[in-house]
């Protein structure tokens, strides 16, 4: 896991954005092999255009849990964005309330280590957080209102994620295949990957069938 993050760093369409409405924070050392970053608003923001409206989401081989917190209406929503194969524009609304966004970005191969469910066949979709992370949602959501800053939310979330981390769900064949593809800069043939991982082409297809 540690070697992979040194070989591969997924980025967004605007990787250098860093302001009050969008900021990426690197996780603690223990979570760094599993979490690409935390991101969101640095603090609650009021009455402004949705900054994401001028942006675009590109396939980044990551999955995101996103919480939108509305301090004016005293409510929140949470959803999971799975792996996307296509780009699409986001936003386009005017935010009149005081709101905040907080999100956890997983590598595609690590989200399952914090979930109670299976992600097979769930690509290009968005789901309610509780469908895949019911225990994490139950513990985290009640705390979101009480901690206004992004840094504060990260502190409590890291503690919960470390408790939820289940490394026994790691698929070694998957990790070996990913390592080989990254090591060869994506030029490896399927037959080469099968030889490296000692699995059949059919089994390899099942492993990558999201």
Label each PLM-derived region with a short phrase.
Residues 207-210:
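HTH DNA-binding helix-turn interface
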Residues 1-175, 181-191, 196-201:
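Alpha-helical bundle regulatory/interaction domains
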């Amino acid at each position: 896991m540690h070697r992979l993050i040194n070989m591969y760093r997924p980025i967004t369409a605007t990787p250098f954005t860093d302001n009050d409405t969008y900021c990426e924070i690197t996780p603690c050392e223990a979570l760094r092999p599993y979490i690409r970053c935390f991101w969101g608003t640095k603090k609650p923001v009021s009455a402004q255009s949705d900054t994401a409206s001028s942006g675009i989401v590109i396939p980044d081989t990551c999955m995101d849990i996103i919480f939108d917190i509305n301090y004016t209406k005293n409510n929140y929503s949470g959803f999971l964005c799975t792996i996307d194969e296509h780009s699409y524009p986001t936003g386009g609304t005017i935010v009149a309330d005081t709101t905040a966004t907080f999100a956890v970005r997983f590598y595609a191969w690590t989200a399952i280590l914090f979930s109670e469910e299976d992600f097979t066949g769930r690509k290009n979709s968005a789901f309610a957080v509780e469908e895949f992370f019911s225990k994490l949602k139950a513990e985290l959501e009640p705390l979101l209102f009480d901690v206004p800053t992004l840094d504060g939310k990260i502190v409590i979330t890291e503690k919960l994620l470390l408790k939820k981390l289940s490394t026994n769900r790691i698929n070694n064949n998957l990790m070996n295949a990913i390592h080989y593809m990254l090591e060869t800069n994506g030029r490896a043939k399927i037959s080469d990957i099968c030889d490296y991982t000692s699995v059949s082409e059919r089994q390899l297809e099942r492993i990558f069938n999201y």
